[in-house]
Design a protein with these regions (language model features):
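Short helix/loop segment immediately N-terminal to the Walker
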Residues: 120-124, 137, 162-167
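Phosphate-coordination/substrate-recognition cap region in phosphate-metabolizing enzymes
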Residues: 30-125, 131, 158
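Extended, histidine- and acidic-residue-enriched regions that form the cofactor-binding/catalytic faces
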Residues: 111, 132, 137, 141-142
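Loop-to-helix element that buttresses phosphate recognition and phosphoryl-transfer chemistry
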Residues: 4-60, 64, 138-154
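Active-site-adjacent alpha-helix immediately C-terminal to a catalytic or transition-state-stabilizing loop
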Residues: 55, 63-64, 69, 146-175
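Beta-strand elements within well-structured catalytic alpha/beta cores of enzymes
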Residues: 1, 47, 73, 167-172
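Residue-level signal for short, function-critical loop segments
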Residues: 3, 78, 174
Length: 175
């Protein structure tokens, strides 16, 4: 999982919004790199989501282990779960507004996504330039855990599984 982000610090639902690592997150990434370095592994494959917090986590790890790969694969399918209309909102405030049970249901139930994010929101992935190369019909407005699982596992099976005989780093999210 990527290091702590700025919105993790603010206790906000992040989803597909591109937020930076917090100072603590940068430290966590470097510590992960130190751990990997001690293992003295030859890592052949590198994957990350499209999101800056995962990309920067991977870069900090690679800098720490002194590896400069030319084969980093960025895959939007490895992105965090899309939290729909909860995106950008503070978790504690939403618990007060909707009730703890309702927020828990959106966060942890298997197939119950939050309400879709309004297409006009600046947080909607269709309005964020890093997603311009993704076909519009593939960009979600919200996701359940099941939707996220299917997206990530499908990508893993089709693209990563064939490389499991090698050492791999995947810098992604804790869905």
């Amino acid at each position: 999982r990527h290091g702590q982000s700025e919105w993790n610090l603010e206790n906000k639902f992040t989803g597909w919004v591109d937020v930076e690592l917090a100072p603590q997150g940068k430290l966590e990434a470097c510590k992960a790199g130190e751990f990997i370095k001690k293992l003295n592994l030859e890592i052949k494959h590198f994957y990350t989501s499209y999101q800056l917090r995962s990309i920067d986590t991977l870069k900090l790890i690679l800098n720490t282990i002194r590896v400069k790969p030319n084969n980093i694969i960025k895959a939007w399918q490895l992105n965090e779960r899309h939290y729909g209309s909860l995106t950008g909102l503070k978790k504690d405030e939403m618990k007060k507004k909707l009730g703890e049970d309702e927020v828990h249901k959106f966060r942890r139930s298997w197939d119950n996504p939050p309400k879709p994010l309004n297409i006009n929101s600046p947080y909607h992935p269709k309005n964020i330039s890093i997603y311009n190369d993704i076909p519009r019909n593939l960009i979600p407005d919200t996701e359940s855990l099941k939707d996220t699982y299917e997206r990530v596992v499908s990508y893993f099976v089709e693209n990563i599984e064939k490389n499991l005989q090698d050492n791999i780093i995947i810098s992604a999210h804790g869905n």
